[in-house]
Amino acid sequence: VVANAPADRIRHPEKPMAGVNPARWLDAMQTADPYPIRAFITCNNPLSAWPHQDRVREAFKSLDLLVHIELFANETSAYADYVLPAATGVEKGEISRASEDRRVVWIDKVIEPPGQAKADGWIWIELGKRFGFDDVLQDKYKDSALFWDEMCINDPWMKGCTQKRLHSVPWRWVRVPVTDEDAPEIETLHLEGTTALGSPEGHRFPTKSGKLEFWSPAQEAKFQALGFSALPEFYTDREQLIDLPYAVRTADGTAVRSPFAKTPADTVTSRIVQPDANSPARALKARGFDMQLITGRPAAPHFHSWTHYAWQAQEMWPDLYVQIHPAKAAALGIEDGREVTVETDHGQIRARAWLHAGIRLDTVFIPIGWDRAQPFHPWPSVNHLTDETQRDPLSDHANLKGYMCRVSARSP
């Protein structure tokens, strides 16, 4: 969606975005760097999903205003000044999640939202009207189908993905790109002899040469601006049990404009270093952090934190667990199903041990999605163990996946 407010009423920020990754916003909330964030409107569950949960809580407490838009109350709701109940897809009409095979799927509205629940679009339009944009954010756009046709598909890839076309088939989906309502769907892109959408005739790929470009001077310049090369160089996160190269910020910590961010945003220059006697991982190992923590999506019944409000999923998988190899558990005096303590250099949590022979002896796995405000089986988020400062220098994404840890038996 492209902003279409009158030109004389569009504010152009004097400073770049506080950061691509929400972890960077914590600095803006707490220290006004690069500028202050005093009010925050959010959905989902940052108080489960963001790294370094102890700091996230302090940052949210420092805000003057926190508004939470969500289907179910969760731990973020508990910190909010205002909670706005949201409507589901079948209560408003919406596009479903993007599919890996480029299918755009429309979900029809079939029932009215319960109680005071409102569609996200309704909330933002009403807020915009109160800021004086009622001539742009018109009431007609509360109809999500009309908003989709008039505002959301104004580009060549999506132009033919209209409500008329979506509803011309019982399954309500179209595989993009489709340049108009009658354009045939393309099952496989970039086949030999085809022309990429928007490219000169005969250009199989949407590049200057029409070929796959693994390196170019323009790419190299972007990577070098951050201290890297466009040619692949292996590095990983710094907390690894084995010695591997990792990226560190340059000593002066100079902020530079990211050449990869779509919206202007600052990042820092970095360099790849080889492990040595002073590397962080060796220091952690010397302190007894002798296992590798891996995080990720939980077992089949759950998806993030959404399903923790369904009693059927709770019956199948109620508790936060830590998978650990039976031999390692025996050495630590840990029994299957008993509570244990998992600790990293950034925090500690408790979880229920799941002895599993399919995991490495030196590795444990803890899923995401739990929080202390869930109605049936509250547990702490695994992100009490993660660190918001460990971010990839190119994407600015935080490391949520791998940390060195130690596990100990916990008395019942």
Q: Positions of the model-derived regions?
A:
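Extended redox/cofactor-interaction regions of prokaryotic respiratory oxidoreductases
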Residues: 1-79, 88-95, 169, 174-332
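Catalytic cores of large soluble enzymes that bind and process phosphate-bearing ligands
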Residues: 14-17, 21, 48, 96, ...
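Short, solvent-exposed loop/turn segments at the edges of secondary structure
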Residues: 35, 78-79, 97-101, 105-106, ...
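Electropositive
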Residues: 86-87, 357
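Long, contiguous, secondary-structure-rich segments that constitute the structural scaffold
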Residues: 120-173, 179-182, 244, 254-255, ...
